[in-house]
Amino acid sequence: MGKCRAQSGAMCPSYQVTQEERYSTRGRAHLLHEMVRGEVIKDGWNNKDIADSFEHCLSCKACKTECPTQVDIATYKAEFMAAHYANKRRPVSHYPLAYIGNLLPKLSRFSGLVNMLQSGIIGKLAQHVLGLSSEKGLPKLAPQSFTNWAKKNAFRQDPQFYRFGAQDQPMVVLWADSVNNHYRPQLLQSAVNVLLKSGHQVAVAKQHFCCGRPLYEYGFLAQALKQLTLILDG
């Protein structure tokens, strides 16, 4: 379909950069189709070409909305990656990227040191290990996470939440996602101010919860399910 090879819109970013069919929505769908048929691709879940194709998928889900058939390549990617690496060693880069939600709270405690190290040879080595482009540097951690800001500025607190606003106002729970919590806390701070001015009280969880999406994207399905269960129990 023509939209799979479009030069504008959101679908598909990996094709728009590489101009290679195997990195398009259509290309990935065809590879999976051939895998299921088993005539051309005979090694099933172990096929390295399909794995390479999905490694370049950003899991942005643009195909879910822009593709006429609403194919959800991101979901197929998660399932394929889980099966492909079930019995083989993963690339080293998968682990820090998949577990970034667990790593960031620890790294943010030493944000100044981490940011300084990123600027030198260690930063370049980290980019190489993570498989990131050398054209742009690693993002800088904020001096203070949103959760720490909430701890210092909350109107009151209880065992689970830092709370802002009057107790007789409707309550909104503001989930501090991993990226905004540690890289762009000012966005969440602004969200608190907007909610307060709109007549709400705001609750911010004391414990940081990663949504589990990075785990899911890399095919760590069991770990992602465990993370979601932890969130629901929390």
Annotate each language-model stretch with its function.
Residues 1-34, 62-82:
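Iron-sulfur cluster-binding cysteine motifs and their immediate structural context
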Residues 2, 36-40, 199:
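Alpha-helix capping/termination and helix-coil
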Residues 31-32, 36, 213-216:
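Gly-rich Lys/Arg/Thr-decorated short loops/hinges at beta-loop-alpha junctions or inter-strand turns
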Residues 41-234:
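Iron-sulfur-cluster electron-transfer modules
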